[in-house]
Design a protein with these regions (language model features):
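Glycine-rich phosphate-binding loop signature in dinucleotide/nucleotide-binding domains
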Residues: 2-6, 89-95
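Short beta-strand scaffold positions
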Residues: 12-13, 80, 100-101
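Domain-level recognition of soluble alpha/beta enzyme cores
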Residues: 63, 116-137
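Amphipathic, non-transmembrane alpha-helical scaffold segments
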Residues: 15, 75-83
């Protein structure tokens, strides 16, 4: 359980639901929460707010195809943003870091620590809401 884990610091997306979650988790911990713009969810552009079934979701997440969609952040730029964030925090002297983020961000984190998934795996990889995933570097 998350309450049994100790953290040095909390990094969080600045988006509302993530902020609320981080504040709930931190309620009795009193840790510093750093809201980092790089943890924002991927910009879905024209698909923002639509159902995954209304567009080719797996193609949207295809790293190899790196499709360009109107006003959307392409997947390779998105992964680079997350990888830059992870490079920054893993170069610091933290023992345990909590990252409160979104499912798309978690796709990039999973690839950063465990190697880039195939296009057939990236799209369908979807952790449960409020799931706890552990990584070591």
């Amino acid at each position: 359980m998350l309450r049994d884990l100790a953290f040095d610091i909390i990094f969080c997306s600045p988006l509302k639901r993530a902020k609320q979650t981080a504040e709930i988790i931190n309620d009795d911990r009193g840790l510093n929460i750093i809201f980092d713009e790089r943890l924002r969810e991927r910009n879905y552009g024209e698909f923002e707010g639509t159902s995954k079934s209304s567009f080719d979701y797996n193609e949207f997440w295809s790293y190899q195809k790196n499709m360009k969609y109107e006003k959307a952040e392409n997947v390779q730029d998105f992964f680079k943003r997350i990888y830059d964030f992870l490079d920054d925090i893993t170069s610091k002297e933290y023992n345990n870091i909590l990252i409160v983020c979104h499912a798309g961000v978690e796709k990039a984190i999973e690839c950063y620590f465990n190697g880039l998934m195939s296009d057939d795996e990236i799209g369908p990889f979807l952790p449960d809401n409020a799931s706890v995933l552990k990584y070591s570097k």
